[in-house]
């Protein structure tokens, strides 16, 4: 194995020129801007930043695109990047000022640097959650004086308009594209005799030195086969738990079936256009389930290319059925209305087991199970793969859904809802997603535009959001004694458009409610009287509405068979 040292600027240039590429086995770019912020902070402090692993293949292999723009001209004998994609893509985006492509959307990676940071920098290490969202949060979304004080203790933050407007903060990308004189002038430095001139200049020099940081690059020799390199890739990434099991499975599949990634991505995009933008891992789980009868990726290494190719044909048919059934039979026209995408796996498997010959009775029974499993969070309570495999086994051995209902009852106890069951349920719960379905069935509309609520409304202004009936900002002022979790309770949430939500802002219910139709408010069980619209009536309102919600959920789920 060869070893070389490359400065960041040269690695970034290699990506831009196409001399450093990604093999098909690699996953997509997944870093959030906060991770990029932390990488820059580490390099600025001259902390070690790991090793880069690459491979010099002897023959041409399938590749996938970087998330940043690269030279489209063919390159002879490029290096293939095995470990370090997230770091180098991030650095390429920041140093070159290029956006990254995430979920088919381009977004800039904007990090701000504090010219006036304290000499003793604040540590910003954070614990990442396993289910961390790909959406970025600004370091100062809601800026107040205390927050600005905390932010000013840092050297780097994710960009926000409020912080960017402060003279001591500059875009990191600008530091690599503009001269000191431009940056210092914008920061209010008037000349060489300015007390901040030397300090700010030294910090700009230190920040630019990130481009000179040297990574050790270990290069696997050309004699290694694609299969062996894939095994190395899986082992390297498994040790640090950097990749999800679906990412590792994808690497093993593409090693056996070259060119399969393009087929997977094309079908994933096709399904997304139909309204179901599902993670590729969901499609791969259906593939494995149809071949092996269970959903875990542990068996991928033993599957042949022939089995994978035949299984993929069955997978596309099964997923087509699952999407059609969810949209047309259940009324779930977006994955945002699912408590777990695993419901689509169970549906696809059921359709295949039935050979797509389904009676009215079976369709109604499965629809009811689907709605109940979604509402009760069948696959969102932990041990999800175990529960899914139990359901696949039930469908395989019994052919009908009696086993599914039995296992659901064993898990949750009761299939109905009481008001007590809803205490503490939030917008992430299956009950809340089911409530949307129930309200839509009742003809609920946006309170201002009179458009039917739907996850598919076009345009940002009409996009449906969940709204706090007693707005959070209002409650902070009017009832600071109320815990924020109580304000986020399902009994205080409704569905309105983004524009209507912004218009209401932090107004009291007693002030904004008279502007809207009582009938439309009532369609979402928002019923005010002389007392419960006042701040002191918050508890009364949520208790009353929680009872109404429980009754409506039970009614909606009970009539599922007759749809």
Give names to the regions the model predicted.
Residues 2-288, 292, 366-373, 377-378, ...:
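Basic- and aromatic-enriched surface patches that contact anionic nucleotides/nucleic acids
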Residues 19-26, 205-222, 227-231, 267-270, ...:
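Short amphipathic alpha-helical segments and their helix-coil junctions
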Residues 40, 92, 230-233, 344-352, ...:
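Short, amphipathic alpha-helical segments that act as regulatory/interfacial helices
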Residues 186-206, 294-321, 463-466, 470:
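An acidic intrinsically disordered interaction segment
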Residues 249, 272-420:
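A cross-family structural signal marking well-folded subdomains
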Residues 375-466, 474:
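Intrinsically disordered, low-complexity N-proximal targeting/linker segments that flank membranes
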Residues 457-492:
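Histidine-centered nuclease catalytic patch
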Residues 486-518:
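Short Cys/His-centered divalent metal-binding micro-motifs
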């Amino acid at each position: 194995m060869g070893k070389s040292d490359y400065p960041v600027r040269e690695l970034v240039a290699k990506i831009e020129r196409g001399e450093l590429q990604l093999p098909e086995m690699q996953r997509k770019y997944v870093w959030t801007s906060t991770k990029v912020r932390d990488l820059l902070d580490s390099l600025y402090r001259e902390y070690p930043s790991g090793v880069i692993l690459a491979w010099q293949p002897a023959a041409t292999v399938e590749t996938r695109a970087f998330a940043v723009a690269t030279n489209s001209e063919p390159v002879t004998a490029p290096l293939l990047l095995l470990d370090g994609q997230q770091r180098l893509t991030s650095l390429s985006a920041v140093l070159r000022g290029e956006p990254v492509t995430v979920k088919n959307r381009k977004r800039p990676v904007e990090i701000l640097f504090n010219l006036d940071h304290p000499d003793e920098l604040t540590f910003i290490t954070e614990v990442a959650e396993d289910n961390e969202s790909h959406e970025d949060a600004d370091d100062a979304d809601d800026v107040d004086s205390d927050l600005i004080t905390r932010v000013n203790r840092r050297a780097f933050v994710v960009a926000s308009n409020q912080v960017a407007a402060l003279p001591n903060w500059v875009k990191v990308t600008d530091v690599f594209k503009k001269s000191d004189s431009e940056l210092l002038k914008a920061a209010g430095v008037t000349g060489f005799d300015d007390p901040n001139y030397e300090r700010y200049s030294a910090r700009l020099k230190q920040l630019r030195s990130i481009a000179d940081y040297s990574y050790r690059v270990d290069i696997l020799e050309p004699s290694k086969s694609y299969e062996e390199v894939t095994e190395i890739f899986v082992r390297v990434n498994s040790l640090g738990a950097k990749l999800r099991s679906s990412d590792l499975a994808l690497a093993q599949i593409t090693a056996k079936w070259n060119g399969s990634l393009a087929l997977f991505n094309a079908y994933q995009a096709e399904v997304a256009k139909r309204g179901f933008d599902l993670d590729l891992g969901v499609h791969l789980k259906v593939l494995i389930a149809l071949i092996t009868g269970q959903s875990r990726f542990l068996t991928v290494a033993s599957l042949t290319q022939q089995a994978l190719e035949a299984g993929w044909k069955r997978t596309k048919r099964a997923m087509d059925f699952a999407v059609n059934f969810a949209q047309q039979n259940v009324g779930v026209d977006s994955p945002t209305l699912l408590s777990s995408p695993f419901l689509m796996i169970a549906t696809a498997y059921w359709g295949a087991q039935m050979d797509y010959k389904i009676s009215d009775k079976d369709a109604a029974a499965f629809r009811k199970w689907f709605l109940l499993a979604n509402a009760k969070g069948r696959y969102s309570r932990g041990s999800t793969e175990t529960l899914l495999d139990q359901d696949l086994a039930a469908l395989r051995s019994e052919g009908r859904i009696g086993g599914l209902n039995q296992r659901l009852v064993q898990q949750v106890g009761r299939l109905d809802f009481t008001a007590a069951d809803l205490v503490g349920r939030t917008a992430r719960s299956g009950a809340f997603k089911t409530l949307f379905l129930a309200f839509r069935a009742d003809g609920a509309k946006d309170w201002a535009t009179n458009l039917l609520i739907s996850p598919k409304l076009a345009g940002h202004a009409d996009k449906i959001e969940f709204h706090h009936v007693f707005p959070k900002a209002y409650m902070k002022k009017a009832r600071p004694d109320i815990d924020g979790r109580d304000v986020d309770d399902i009994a205080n949430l409704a569905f309105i458009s983004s524009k209507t939500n912004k218009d209401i802002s932090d107004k009291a219910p007693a002030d904004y409610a008279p502007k809207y139709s009582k009938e439309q408010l009532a369609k979402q069980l928002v019923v005010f009287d002389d007392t419960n619209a006042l701040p002191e009536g918050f508890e009364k309102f949520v208790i009353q509405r929680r009872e109404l919600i429980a009754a409506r959920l039970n009614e909606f789920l009970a009539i599922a068979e007759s749809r």
